[in-house]
């Protein structure tokens, strides 16, 4: 699962213009160009009951080429930046194309990718003043929504492997901050955590990791 998350999120982050360090190789040309004659995954929109927010919330789910309900899959929860929603990665990137290409090249183990809306409030659209206190607070509230509402829904609806070793979380900007905070704060739930150009903590460091090793 570690290599899966690193390869995928690095490719997606590169697509968004995240600057790579010299020790990290650049993605090869055409990594996000749609190719003909290869198997494609499926994207669907789901709606889940959020007891945290008190409403139904939307997320996008990518299932890999050859998806079968008789198999079990690891899951990556991929979070967007502060100005986006569950559609953000598709509006400004091509995650489904990148995934399909990586599968065609034999570089990924089949997995499910969940793209949620990380702004856990009733009016969760990225409209108006996205820096308003209530909208920013929604990104911290999403931790409870993710753990108590979204993950249980995904694990009830899709054939996934229900252990920390098969559960990853990663994101860009605000989503990167959420990934670090939620992932490091819940290491019993997530074995793999990735943050890219991550926003500041939603929690104080001593609360986030009270017993650093």
Model-derived features: positions:
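Non-catalytic cap/lid and distal C-terminal segments of serine-dependent acyl enzymes
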Residues: 21-213
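Bacterial N-terminal signal peptides
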Residues: 7-15
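Sec/Tat signal peptide C-region and signal peptidase I cleavage site
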Residues: 16-20
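Positively charged n-region of N-terminal signal peptides that target proteins for export
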Residues: 1-5
